[in-house]
From Swiss-Prot:
Keyword line: Cell membrane, Chemotaxis, Cytokine, Disulfide bond, Glycoprotein, Membrane, Secreted, Signal, Transmembrane, Transmembrane helix
Lineage: Eukaryota, Metazoa, Chordata, Craniata, Vertebrata
Extracellular side: 30-205
Annotated glycan sites: 168
Protein's recorded name: C-X-C motif chemokine 16
Gene that produces this protein: CXCL16
An example Gene Ontology molecular-function term: low-density lipoprotein particle receptor activity
Gene Ontology CC: one annotated term: membrane
Membrane topology, as annotated: Single-pass type I membrane protein
Spans annotated as Chemokine: 32-107
Range of residues in the leader sequence: 1-29
Ranges that cross the membrane: 206-226
Length: 254
């Protein structure tokens, strides 16, 4: 049968065999063929495991993993990483994703929970204030004794208290002045707006009037040209032609 094949058919058969061998070769990070469904953007060998920084990056941006024939593919946002099924870092990432302790979705949930957590210091302060308000009978008795044993304040302290109240009075006066100045400032702001109103209207009417004047001049010039053309095209009055009389001989019968 080999003798019956022509040289051209032998070459064609050889090319088909070479193409079949090329397609069955394993590609870069793709077991089976170049056009397989388990493609890897980066293949990490078992002899050189990834660094700690790279592992942290994978834990943060990892989305899913797929089990292939001899390796596992980890899918990230725009690329993929593959490693052997029995590699320790592969097993660690797989268990982390199964337990939902890492990955892109887990980092989003953690960030959302941080925003929702309430602040604890105000609650503790409120509880401390509530506990300080509760007094035992012994504490109340001590407070009354201390209040009765307090010495009376001298006159100088009273004058100092009065001096301390003066800044408050000055602040009240300044606040009243600012409140009174508020409506005046509003009226002063309204007056420039009222003055600016007529000027804006006049500035808007000036171009309109100029446009109307230009249109009027153009229509007058056009009507003048048309009237001049009509006068030139009208038939001029022709002069009177002379009348020629032919003498007629008188009839002999008459």
């Amino acid at each position: 049968m080999g003798r019956d094949l022509r040289p051209g058919s032998r070459v064609l058969l050889l090319l088909l065999l070479l193409l079949l061998v090329y397609l069955t070769q394993p590609g870069n990070g793709n077991e089976g063929s170049v056009t397989g469904s388990c493609y890897c953007g980066k293949r990490i060998s078992s002899d050189s495991p990834p660094s700690v920084q790279f592992m942290n990056r994978l834990r943060k941006h990892l989305r899913a993993y797929h089990r292939c024939l001899y390796y596992t593919r980890f899918q990230l946002l725009s690329w993929s990483v593959c490693g052997g099924n029995k590699d320790p870092w592969v097993q660690e990432l797989m268990s982390c994703l199964d337990l939902k302790e890492c990955g892109h979705a887990y980092s989003g949930i953690v960030a959302h929970q941080k925003h929702l957590l309430p602040t604890s210091p105000p609650i503790s302060q409120a509880s401390e204030g509530a506990s300080s308000d509760i007094h035992t009978p012994a504490q109340m008795l001590l407070s009354t004794l201390q209040s009765t044993q307090r010495p009376t304040l001298p006159v100088g302290s009273l004058s100092s208290d009065k001096e301390l109240t003066r800044p408050n009075e000055t602040t009240i006066h300044t606040a009243g002045h600012s409140l009174a100045a508020g409506p005046e400032a509003g009226e002063n702001q309204k007056q420039p707006e009222k003055n600016a109103g007529p000027t804006a209207r006049t500035s808007a009417t000036v171009p309109v009037l100029c446009l109307l004047a230009i249109i009027f001049i153009l229509t007058a010039a056009l009507s003048y040209v048309l009237c001049k053309r009509r006068r030139g095209q009208s038939p001029q009055s022709s002069p009177d032609l002379p009348v020629h009389y032919i003498p007629v001989a008188p009839d002999s019968n008459t």
